[in-house]
């Protein structure tokens, strides 16, 4: 875990790359990353970035309201799978096992004042077509209820996980991923669609011309990876597109 001084250095290092938006991530344990700790990180980030997004554990509306006051604008929650039976087999303990609480996190974030929310299933955990459909309907229904809210989709699929070679994705290859992204674009034409660095350069270069509206750049998934020579903790997943912010910018311009 980074302290306030280390967070400041990390934010400075990221801002120096030219990025104007930042995503703050934590694990699923409030004991490791309290709401107050995340709020402090948001206050620091606000000095350097125009938009602050959160990928953190689900919270109550009052906690989202506090983080919004600290500077957070956007909340993304990965439902992982919308198959509640499958979900139970993946989460045997802790707060994350409560399926409805996670499912309703985006609405609580909107009620807490967040200007936008993001949706995603981890494609490949279960039937990816059913999960993609459920993700789309989840976002659509919230958009109807809260028309002022900005809606975004992320499209992660199971990829190689560091220190784990037993994951067996259920056939979510690039053609299927493209189909899902295009379906989101047609179904909700004003939604944002983000493609992460888990996907390869070629796919990201092409999808930005077809349907995606946002791609990450200069990503380092190690804790303190932008500002420290020796990162704290392990990386979570492998990066397929390791290009810098300048390289991504040049690709988009070209």
Give, region by region, the residue ranges found by the protein language model:
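Core AdoMet radical
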Residues: 1-10, 14-109, 115-119, 125, ...
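Alpha-helix N-cap and loop-to-helix initiation/capping positions
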Residues: 2, 33, 37, 93-101, ...
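A general structural detector for well-ordered alpha-helical segments in enzyme core domains, enriched
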Residues: 7-10, 37-41, 63, 101-105, ...
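Amphipathic, soluble alpha/beta structural segments
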Residues: 21, 38, 42, 46, ...
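Catalytic cores of alpha/beta
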Residues: 60-69, 115, 125-141, 200-210
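Short alpha-helix boundary/capping motifs
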Residues: 73-74, 95-96, 137, 212-213, ...
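Auxiliary Fe-S-binding modules of radical SAM enzymes
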Residues: 133, 143-254
């Amino acid at each position: 875990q980074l302290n306030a001084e280390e967070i400041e250095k990390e934010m400075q290092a990221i801002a120096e790359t030219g990025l104007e938006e930042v995503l703050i991530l934590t694990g699923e344990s409030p004991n490791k990353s309290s709401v107050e700790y995340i709020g402090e990180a948001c206050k620091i980030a606000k000095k350097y970035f125009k938009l602050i997004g959160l990928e953190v554990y689900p919270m109550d509306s009052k906690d989202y309201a506090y983080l919004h006051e600290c500077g957070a604008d956007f909340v993304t929650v990965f439902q992982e799978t919308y198959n509640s039976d499958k979900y139970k087999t993946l989460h045997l303990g802790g707060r994350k096992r409560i399926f409805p609480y996670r499912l309703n996190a985006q609405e609580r974030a909107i009620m807490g004042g967040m200007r936008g929310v993001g949706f995603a299933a981890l494609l490949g955990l279960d039937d990816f077509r059913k999960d993609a459909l459920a993700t789309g309907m989840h976002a659509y229904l919230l958009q109807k209820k809260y028309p002022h809210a900005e809606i975004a989709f992320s499209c992660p699929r199971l990829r190689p996980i560091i220190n784990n070679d037993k994951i067996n994705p259920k056939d979510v290859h690039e053609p299927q991923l493209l189909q899902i992204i295009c379906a989101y674009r047609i179904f909700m034409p004003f939604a944002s669609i983000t493609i992460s660095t888990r996907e390869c350069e070629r796919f990201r270069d092409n999808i930005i011309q077809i349907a995606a509206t946002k791609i990450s750049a200069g990503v380092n998934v190690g804790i303190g990876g932008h500002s420290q020579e020796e990162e704290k903790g392990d990386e979570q997943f492998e990066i397929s597109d390791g290009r810098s912010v300048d390289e991504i910018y040049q690709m988009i311009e070209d």
